[in-house]
């Protein structure tokens, strides 16, 4: 039987005693587990079939969430569907009439319905007029985008229960702001990052500068970025099987790095499996184009393999929500907004599975980093002649806000 950590139980209690509200939990704290356990308990108490909607910012994350819910709930009396334009082995449609038909068929059959969708497609669920019992908004800071807000405001108003989960809330002066309680409800709980570290859920990040030998310009960006990535990888000595995420400046930079330099040859020579994903070019593993589902499955497989070396290049796709197991390092080749910066840090502060198990088995205590296989998550930034210094300063400020002051980073 799965046991929630104390802070997760408090968050679950907050959800179950409020019909609407914001749940702020740092990245790596298991927000999805809180959603899934809430759904599981509601189903166990239900006297009639329930309809759940789970909203994610990206198709890849919607698919990941669906897989996690399926495994966690392990219930044959549940029908799963997707409402987005991406790939899935489940039934999918953005046609409101078909969405309504699917949900109604499940209900008539006495079974529960889960609809996984994106912020871009939530209006299709609204148009279907499906009676929604519970909606979970994942990475809910995306709600404040003007083209998302109308849809989520309607969903929040129509659903019986609405919950907004994020590590990085976004406040501003407009009606879309997450402090608009008529749409988002109140902040029903906020968990400090130190509590997650003390519980053995995450590890602290370590900001590292890499002194580049070359001055980066628009003309030589691909060449310098590629050289810096290789140099950083050659300098990794704390693990024999680095698992590295690269936050790239643009899809164009990734493509030029691969087609105009020898970086692919060097990475293969170093024993790395090379993965990259962008909205423009799709997903690739070692020059072979694959579906997003296969890409995600392989990321999970490689992350769980203690001997596997791999590197993932992305542009603004894997920064948030994606559960890439085992990442040891992140190379930040571009400046990022505060929210995306905090989310990127979150990719590398997940606990090593062996460390998590050792703590659970009582072989060591949470926070005894000297005994951890993975005592910290490295975030590396290339610098040269003041280039990169501002990024490091901003990143360190974000890290201090979250991990030293214990505050929620609000943009």
What are the functions of these language-model segments?
Residues 1-19:
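N-terminal pre-P-loop "Q-motif" helix
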Residues 18-38:
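Walker A/P-loop
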Residues 33-37, 48-71, 249-255:
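Conserved Walker A/P-loop ATP-binding site and its immediately adjacent core
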Residues 60-95:
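Conserved helix-turn-beta segment of the N-terminal RecA-like "Helicase ATP-binding" lobe
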Residues 102-152, 314-316:
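Conserved RecA-like ASCE ATPase "motif II neighborhood" in helicase/translocase motors
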Residues 142, 281-409:
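Conserved RecA-like P-loop NTPase helicase motor core
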Residues 142-202:
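Post-DEXD/H (motif II) to motif III coupling segment of the RecA-like Helicase ATP-binding lobe
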Residues 186-260:
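Conserved interdomain linker/interface between the two RecA-like ATPase lobes of SF2 helicase motors
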């Amino acid at each position: 039987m799965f046991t929630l950590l104390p802070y997760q139980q408090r968050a679950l209690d907050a959800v179950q005693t409020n019909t609407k509200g914001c749940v702020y939990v740092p990245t790596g704290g298991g927000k999805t587990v809180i959603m899934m356990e809430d759904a599981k308990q509601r189903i166990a108490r239900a006297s009639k079939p329930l309809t759940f909607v789970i909203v994610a910012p990206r198709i890849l994350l919607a698919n990941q969430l669906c897989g996690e819910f399926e495994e966690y709930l392990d219930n044959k009396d549940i029908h799963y569907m997707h409402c987005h334009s991406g790939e899935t082995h489940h039934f999918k449609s953005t046609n409101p009439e078909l969405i309504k038909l699917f949900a109604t068929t499940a209900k008539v059959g006495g079974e529960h319905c889960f609809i996984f969708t994106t912020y871009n497609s939530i209006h299709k669920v609204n148009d279907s007029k499906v009676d929604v019992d519970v909606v979970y908004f994942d990475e809910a800071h995306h709600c404040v985008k003007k083209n998302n807000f109308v849809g989520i405001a309607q969903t929040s108003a129509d659903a019986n229960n609405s919950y907004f989960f994020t590590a990085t809330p976004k406040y501003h002066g407009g009606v879309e702001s997450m402090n608009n309680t008529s749409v988002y409800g109140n902040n029903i709980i906020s968990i400090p990052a130190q509590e997650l570290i003390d519980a053995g859920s995450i590890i602290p990040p370590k900001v590292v500068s890499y002194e580049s030998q070359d001055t980066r310009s628009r003309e030589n960006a691909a060449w310098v970025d590629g050289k810096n990535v290789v140099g950083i990888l050659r300098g990794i000595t704390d693990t024999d099987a680095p698992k590295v995420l690269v936050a790239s400046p643009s899809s164009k930079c990734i493509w030029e790095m691969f087609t105009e330099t020898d970086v692919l040859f060097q990475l293969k020579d170093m024993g790395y499996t090379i993965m990259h994903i962008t909205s423009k070019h799709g997903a690739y593993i070692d020059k072979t184009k694959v579906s997003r589902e296969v890409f995600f499955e392989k990321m999970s497989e490689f992350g769980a393999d203690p001997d596997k070396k791999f590197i993932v290049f992305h542009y603004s796709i894997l920064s948030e929500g994606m559960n890439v197991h085992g990442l040891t390092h992140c190379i930040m080749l571009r400046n990022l907004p505060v929210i995306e910066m905090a989310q990127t840090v979150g990719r590398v502060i997940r606990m090593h599975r062996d460390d998590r198990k050792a703590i659970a088995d009582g072989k060591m205590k949470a926070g005894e980093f000297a005994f951890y296989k993975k005592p910290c998550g490295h975030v590396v930034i290339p610098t040269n002649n003041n280039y990169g210094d501002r990024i490091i300063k901003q990143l360190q400020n974000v890290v201090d806000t979250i991990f030293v002051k214990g505050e929620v980073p609000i943009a």
